[in-house]
Amino acid sequence: MTEQQKKFPEFYVTAPQPCPYLAGRLERKLFTHLTNDKPPELIDRLLTTGFRRSQNIAYVPYCEGCQACVSVRVLVDEFEPNRSMSRITARNRRLVARRIAPEPSSEQYRLFRTYIDARHSDGGMADMSVLDYRMMIEDSVIDTFLTEYREKPEGAVDLAIDQWPLKAVALCDRLTDGISMVYSFYDPAEANASLGTFMILDHIAFARRIGLPHLYLGYWIEGSRKMAYKAKFGPQERLGTDTWERVEPSSSSD
C-alpha cells in the first residue's frame, strides 16, 4: 500500500439490496477497509462523521434518492433521564457492569444466540456461527471494549463476579470525542427489564465519568419503529449535510 493510499483510503459501493428498515426500498453502502497502517486520526474522523464500524469495515449509507439514515449522538453532559429511564435504572440495580477487553467467550455466544433466535431470527445475523461472533468481537484496529452486565445473586458473598449470571453484553469503540455503541444484546427472557435502554443509560454515565462528550448510537430513521427509541435520549445531535444539529428529546419520552 502506498503512502497516498494510507492517507486517502479507497472506497467501494455495495450492490443494491432490500432495505431492512424501509419497506420497498433498496440500500447501498459506501465502505472502506480499516487497517493498522491507516492513520488513527483518519479512522477516528470517519467514525465521528457518520461512518459506522463493522469489524474492520467502516461504512455509511449510500442510497440513491434516500437520505433517511441520520447519525445521532447523545450530548452526555446535558443528558437527564426521564421518569421512565430512572425506573429502568432502579429495576436493574442488581446488575453490575464490567468493562473488559474484546475477548469473546462461549458464555457470551450462548447469550448472543438466544437473543438472535428470539428477537432477530429472520435478520442478517441469524446464521452467525461461533467463529463469526469471534470475528465481530476481535476484529478491530481501534480502541474497542466489551461491557458485560452480570446479575449479583442473592447472598452471593463468596461467588466471583464472572460466575454471576450474564444478562447483557455491549460492544463499543472509544473515540477521541465519545463512545460508539457498535452492537449490544441481552437475555430476551428479561424483556420487562428494558435492558437495551439500560445499557445506553449506563454508557452515557460511563462516557460522562471518563470525560467524553458524546455517545454515538448509530443511525436513526424517522418513521422507523425499530429506530424510534433513539430519539428518547437527548439532548442529542443529528448529522446534517454539513454539521451536527442539536435536537431535544422527543416529547413522548416520559
Where are these regions (language model features)?
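Conserved acetyl-CoA-binding loop-helix of GNAT-fold acetyltransferases
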Residues: 192-204
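Active-site/acyl-donor-binding loops of N-acyltransferases
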Residues: 60-61, 70-77, 213-254
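Residue-level preference for non-acidic, small/hydrophobic
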Residues: 112, 200-203, 230
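A conserved beta-strand-loop-helix scaffold within acyl/acetyltransferase catalytic domains
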Residues: 52-65, 72-192, 232
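Intrinsically disordered, low-complexity, positively biased terminal segments
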Residues: 1-85, 92
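Hydrophobic pocket-lining residues that define ligand/cofactor binding sites across diverse proteins
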Residues: 207
